[in-house]
Amino acid sequence: MVIAKGAGSVTTVAERVKPESVYSRFVAFREGLGVEVLPASGGTSSAFAVLAQRLQAGKLACLVCDRDVTGGGMEVEFFGEKARMMGGPAALAVQTGAALMPVILWFEGDHWGAHVHAEIPVPAEGDSKQQAAAMMQQVARLFEAGIRAHPQDWHMLQCVFAADLDPARLAAAESAAGTGRSEGGS
């Protein structure tokens, strides 16, 4: 997912995995490529607020959003089932006016293939949460098409579909995120 409001350096968010040494290696690798990495949790400031600042300064944000890592993701229909995806990309587009442009990646032998989709515009109707939810539903549809075209390249090692989620674990994640069953997320 690319959210753009101009050109410049790239910022992303990384899930804070355990042990910390593994997270540090992921961050060091990405930073070695010139990517600014914000922690999804445990940072000195909100990743969402920093991303909004970067976008307003004309920089790029590249965000993975095909799974809910916080418990506060948005519910979408995905392959005919309810699923939860991170809503931050759409919420950032609504708040900052940055372009929301889904990207599909796949392998072609030893090389990458990529399709950068056209901007998903902010809907004229609804409040900011409704607008972001409608945009994330469009993202889900584009992801479905990309996964159908390249199913071998969707590397999902966690439950995505609501029916597959452990209710107790989901409730704990939602409680930790302070969201309940929110429509928001970042």
Predicted regions and their residues:
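Non-catalytic C-terminal accessory region of glycerolipid acyltransferases
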Residues: 6-7, 32-33, 45-186
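Conserved nucleotide-cofactor-binding alpha/beta core module
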Residues: 1-59
